């Protein structure tokens, strides 16, 4: 087997700190210049798509509900890696040149849009119907009631699950390495390929960087939730 032919894939008797120090910045730079921008862009576009999808699935127009329901079902029913490869090879099939990074943004945005739409839809439905009636009573239209009364309340409810979606997306971007996006994990793979005898150390280092990023984001999430809780009646 391939693994049996490799040099020792263990930590050995001592951790190669020189290699860890030399590889730390190249791996981290992949996170700074690719992983984080990829996550932010995908999340922003995904949230726009999620809001559109959530509202469309609550629409009274049946064909609209059906189209977006199929979209959500297709995304939730297929692996993210498969979706990534489909988008990556879809545009060249129509003679359209698209670099790996924008291909990854499109794929991750579509994925986030489907999953986040369910969160947003559930958050909107959790707002008491009396809030709708209150908006109508003071002369607001359906659209104004939605955007000025309902969505602000739904937003607070959706913060925890959407924050978890964002943190999960950070980790999911490692799949972009499969289409040659030079993100954090891809950098680790490249360095590991040149140091096969210490490849485990490189991957542990990459995992540590992912963990630190996600841990810091979790702290930010906790602060936001505590601030929002101040406005909730106990």
UniProtKB/Swiss-Prot annotation:
Localization, UniProt: Cell membrane
Any one GO MF annotation of this record: L-cystine transmembrane transporter activity
Topological category with respect to the lipid bilayer: Multi-pass membrane protein
Record carries keyword Transferase: no
Keywords: Amino-acid transport, Cell membrane, Membrane, Transmembrane, Transmembrane helix, Transport
CDD domains per record: TM_PBP2
Free-text function comment from the UniProt entry: Part of the ABC transporter complex TcyABC involved in L-cystine import. Probably responsible for the translocation of the substrate across the membrane.
Name of the protein in its database record: L-cystine transport system permease protein TcyB
Annotated organism of origin: Bacillus subtilis (strain 168)
């Amino acid at each position: 087997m391939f693994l049996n032919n490799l040099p020792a894939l263990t930590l050995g008797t001592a951790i190669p700190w020189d290699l860890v120090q030399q590889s730390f910045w190249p791996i981290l730079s992949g996170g700074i210049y690719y992983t984080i921008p990829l996550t932010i862009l995908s999340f922003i576009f995904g949230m726009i798509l999620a809001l559109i999808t959530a509202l469309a699935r609550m629409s009274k127009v049946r064909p609209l509900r059906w189209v977006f329901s199929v979209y959500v079902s297709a995304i939730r029913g297929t692996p993210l890696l498969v979706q990534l490869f489909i988008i990556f090879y879809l545009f060249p099939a129509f003679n359209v040149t698209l670099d790996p990074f924008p291909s990854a943004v499109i794929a991750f945005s579509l994925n986030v849009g489907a999953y986040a739409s369910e969160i947003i839809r559930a958050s909107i439905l959790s707002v008491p119907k009396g809030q709708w009636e209150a908006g109508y009573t003071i002369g607001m239209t359906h659209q104004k009631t939605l955007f000025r009364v309902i969505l602000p309340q739904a937003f607070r409810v959706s913060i925890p699950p959407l924050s978890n979606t964002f943190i999960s997306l950070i980790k999911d971007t490692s799949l972009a390495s499969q289409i040659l996006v030079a993100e954090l994990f891809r950098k680790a793979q490249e360095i590991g390929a040149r140091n096969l005898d210490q490849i485990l150390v490189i991957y542990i280092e990459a995992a540590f960087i992912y963990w630190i990023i996600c841990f810091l984001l979790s702290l930010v999430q906790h602060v936001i939730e505590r601030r929002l809780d101040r406005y909730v009646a106990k």
